[in-house]
Amino acid sequence: MVTSAGVGHAEYNNGADVQHADYAHLTSVGQVEQKPLGGRLGALAEYYKPNVASMEEYRAMHAQSITDPAAFYGERARTYVDWFRPFDAVFLPGPDGRPSFDNNAWFVNGQLNACYNLVDRHAARTPDKVAIIYEADEPGEGYSLTYRELLAQVCKVAQVLQYSMGVRKGDTVAVYMPMIPQALVTLLAISRIGAIHSVVFAGFSSNSLRDRINDARSEVVVTTDESKRGGKIIETKRIVDDAIKETPQLRKVLVYKRTCNPSVSYVADRDLDWDTEVKKYKSYCPCEPVDSEHPLFLLYTSGSTGAPKGVQHSTAGYLLQAYLSMLYSFDVHSDDIFFTAGDIGWITGHTYVVYGPLFSGCTTVVFEGTPAYPSYSRYWDIIDKYSVTQFYVAPTALRLLKRAGDSYVDGYSLRTLRSLGTVGEPIAAEVWEWYYTVIGKREIPVIDTYWQTESGAHLVTPLAGGSTPMKPGSASFPFFGIDLAILDPQTGEELLGPNVEGVLAVKQPWPSFTRTIWNNHDRYLDTYLNPYKGYYFAGDGAARDSQGFIWILGRVDDVVNVSGHRLSTAEVEAAIIQESMVAECAVVGFADELTGQAIAAFVVLKQKSSWNTASERELQEIKKHLILSVRRDIGPFAAPKLIVLVDDLPKTRSGKIMRRILRKILAGEADQLGDVSTLSNPGIVKHLIESVKF
């Protein structure tokens, strides 16, 4: 069992402030009454008929997705997915006839190809429709690709991978690229030939990249010479070169020249130039049929034990659930312009920059830059310039833009928007209100989504189009296929009814649920399925209020969420402890106004007396050195915001570090520590409290 650490410290609004978005209001507990659409949505209502029209329809669909998943998913898989060979069964049933975590497989014996469903069929039906709008870091440097052009580029790169680099069906290919169209082309080319892509966020250090390449056993890497972000140059090729010094299986590197910097070094017979290679091949090659359960990609995510986990997703189940979330969560139609301000190095970019939008046949916006460059108006400029219909972004960016001021929004109409999404972390009520009021003009619904790398698509979310009500800060209701439960963290018993708080779990698998951890199925079981037998344990605390709304309360394991990025505290601790001056270290998360959570490291040095007598300047140099160690080992985004040098750490008599005490002190709750007399060193608590200075 896991403990309830972290649960119960978040505030949630139990029953008030239900928002109408000018389309629905709550009349009693659990009941929603519809009223006519108003404002901009009302003007579009006839043209954009909602994919889910009412709360009643949502309830009926959700019930079917849980009680009769064969009918719910079977009908949609036959309707929306193009198959090379039809499936024999929707899922492999467990002993009770329902989907089972013990043998989770969907669309049994079916064959398909992800790239065909994302590109080929649209290139055949709507070849001149824009598939990708590229907004480069520097305004005015972007361009667009139609589905016809995208197909040609994908086929050429697929042949480069096959014939110039020797990639075969089932091989893993590492991808370390910025947010440019060639990154999407690469992912599609890999899936076209039946290989498996393993994208590593291009902000990770060479050490982190090395570890992921080795764990995935990738023999090929695709990267760029450099990348540009926020007006700055990032040396991606140099990072790759450093990483593969310790990847003995690595054979080839494909390099797209983003900046064409002549000083970037290349290794003969290993490094291939993108432009030179694609010229060798024709603009079409056939797709490789793969089984429904064939791995589509690996995506590494932080775990509480420190070593990153290669979360493996299947092809058919992931594609269908990703598309259904586009269809229902965002009410997407095929002529929409979908803008996710996320990176393909994370699951948000996989599902809502690449697979969801392109499967839907709509247009996806690929943004290379940051929300603040060259000004805080950058997002709003993109939305107006390209007539964006759905916008999806992390609360961290919204906090930054809210702080910058409403003047940066002035002058932008944002009139084409039909839904505003948030992703990666819970959104504070005041930020939700700003987003809804200043950006949405109190007419556009805020789709506050909760999901994970492991889930592949949404777990809890409102639905755009008018069917479900909203409440600031709540993720609302379970998505289709999600049989959600809130469990008592100690007993594992389900807490039924309203006004309950515990750990979030799911009772049965859904099509896009991860199948395993690459090369480590035992860890998969221990992390997700063994903590509470019969359930998927999501690792987050949750509450259900009096009206049935779900509130996400944050992690209950040793994972910190910084700007929507999950980081293992153990991984950060390892980066600090490797320094010869460090004896012990404990890393915890604490609340941060901008990033949601930030990282604090409590560090015990080997020479305790030396830092007690050191000058303030010397202490700052020690702290800078430790922060640099984390930046170098993991990446800049993982750098601790606070380093606290201490004489000792709070420990039980068995030697376990009590991180709960550190979290309480950082939260200003030193008066709520409870009985500390059982610590092996209770006197250290006063020292810790006095040492924390923001």
Swiss-Prot record:
Q: Which domain of life is it from?
A: Eukaryota
Q: Which GO terms describe its molecular function?
A: acetate-CoA ligase activity; acid-ammonia (or amide) ligase activity; AMP binding; ATP binding
Question: Its principal location?
Answer: other
Catalyzes what?
acetate + ATP + CoA = acetyl-CoA + AMP + diphosphate
Q: Residue ranges for motif Microbody targeting signal?
A: 692-694
Q: Which organism is it from?
A: Eremothecium gossypii (strain ATCC 10895 / CBS 109.51 / FGSC 9923 / NRRL Y-1056) (Yeast)
Q: Which GO terms describe its biological process?
A: acetate fermentation; acetyl-CoA biosynthetic process; acetyl-CoA biosynthetic process from acetate
Q: What is this protein called?
A: Acetyl-coenzyme A synthetase 1
Q: Which PROSITE patterns match?
A: AMP_BINDING
